[in-house]
């Protein structure tokens, strides 16, 4: 069998490898001649085995290291927002204290100036109308829910406190079951003289004023003489009888020398016109819607008022308008008169205030005695005399 040259080469390689592997171990230096067999390219065999796997660890360590690089920028944004916040806080604080002292000093200075404003309040008190009531009634009102209504009268002026705290106020409900019947007062009679008069719109009612007071004796009660000062009207009536209210109430206000008052009141139902009011219609129309205006009426004889009354109620009370003074003797006729609806309307239209009434609400009777005068048959006369009780 023939062996090719390649085969011989392989045989030589194998023999050389066998010789190298079979060489004794304790003689390491002798392998130096081994380089001679290396030319047959035994080295390529270690090439596949060379530890080139070592580069594998290289890719793992370097690439995780760049991760720490992004960490430094994180602290930068955090400090940035924190510094601007404290800066605006001090800015607003300094300007606030500065303006506050400026307005405070001027405000206490004007405070004493408005102090004199309460001074005008006493105006109604120093200038009462004849008969003790307020001359200008626009200082109060009859609106029950208003700030100047009857429930507030006592707080509107120091001189009007009795309107709120008085225990003998007027008007009241006159109940027959609670009265004391008496025939000791005497019949109702007046002694008036003709007098010059004017008619005036006071703001809530129409007043007929007797200039200088009527010079007649007027009426006498408990030995005291009272002269007629003025008369005025309320609609509906202020007093009631046994709970019934009437269309109109007329007040004849008398005054004594010591500033006490006697008021004689007449109540009206709707019906035939009243002759005395009829005689004043021309003047009433002239003062319509003209507050504080005063029209000359001329000479009037109060006897035309038809003063007679056989039965009347008597009690101690007050003025029914501010200042509500409790120094009034009331005589309220039990005999009802008549007035036309046109006349009642004329009295209200002439005033033309915000209310549809100028009647004060009823007041408590409290412990007062109310008398009903009923004369003996032999004493009944045409005129009545008001005497003491």
Curated annotation (Swiss-Prot):
It catalyses: hydrogencarbonate + H(+) = CO2 + H2O. One of its GO terms (molecular function) is hydro-lyase activity. InterPro entries: Alpha_CA_prokaryot-like (IPR041891), CA_dom (IPR001148), CA_dom_sf (IPR036398), Carbonic_anhydrase_a-class (IPR023561). Residues 1-22 form the signal peptide. Zn(2+) binds at residues 232, 234, 251. Residues 25-129 have a biased composition (Pro residues). Pfam families: Carb_anhydrase. Reversible hydration of carbon dioxide. Belongs to the alpha-class carbonic anhydrase family. This is Alpha carbonic anhydrase 8. The gene is ACA8.
């Amino acid at each position: 069998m023939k062996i090719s040259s390649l085969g011989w080469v392989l045989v030589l390689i194998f023999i050389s490898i066998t010789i190298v592997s079979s060489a004794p171990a304790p003689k390491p230096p002798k392998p130096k001649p081994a380089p001679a067999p290396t030319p047959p390219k035994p080295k390529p065999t270690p090439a596949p085995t060379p530890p080139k796997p070592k580069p594998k660890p290289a890719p793992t360590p370097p690439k995780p290291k760049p991760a720490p690089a992004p960490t430094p920028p994180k602290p930068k944004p955090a400090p940035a927002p924190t510094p601007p916040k404290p800066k605006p806080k001090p800015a607003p604080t300094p300007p606030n204290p500065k303006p506050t002292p400026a307005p405070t000093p001027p405000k206490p200075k004007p405070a004493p100036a408005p102090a004199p404003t309460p001074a005008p309040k006493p105006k109604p008190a120093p200038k009462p109308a004849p008969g003790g009531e307020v001359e200008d009634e626009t200082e109060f009102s009859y609106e029950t829910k208003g700030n100047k209504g009857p429930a507030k009268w006592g707080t509107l002026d120091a001189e009007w406190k009795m309107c709120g705290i008085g225990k003998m106020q007027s008007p009241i409900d006159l109940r027959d079951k609670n009265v004391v019947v008496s025939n000791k007062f005497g019949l109702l009679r007046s002694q008036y003289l003709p007098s010059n008069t004017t008619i005036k719109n006071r703001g809530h009612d129409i007043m007929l004023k007797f200039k200088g007071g009527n010079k007649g004796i007027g009426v006498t009660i408990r030995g005291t003489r009272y002269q007629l000062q003025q008369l005025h009207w309320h609609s509906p009536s202020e007093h009631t009888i046994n709970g019934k209210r009437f269309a109109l109430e007329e007040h004849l206000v008398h005054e004594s020398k010591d500033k006490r008052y006697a008021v004689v009141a007449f109540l009206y139902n709707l019906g035939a016109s009243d002759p005395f009011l009829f005689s004043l219609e021309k003047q009433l129309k002239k003062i319509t819607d003209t507050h504080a205006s005063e029209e000359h009426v001329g000479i009037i004889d109060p006897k035309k008022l038809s003063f007679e009354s056989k039965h009347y109620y008597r009690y101690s009370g007050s003025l029914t308008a501010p200042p509500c003074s409790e120094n009034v003797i009331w005589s309220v006729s039990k005999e009802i008169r008549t007035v036309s609806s046109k006349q009642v309307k004329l009295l209200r239209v002439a005033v033309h205030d915000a209310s549809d009434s100028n009647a004060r609400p009823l007041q408590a009777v409290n412990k007062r005695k109310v008398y009903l005068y009923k004369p003996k048959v032999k004493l009944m006369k045409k005129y009545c005399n008001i005497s003491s009780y």
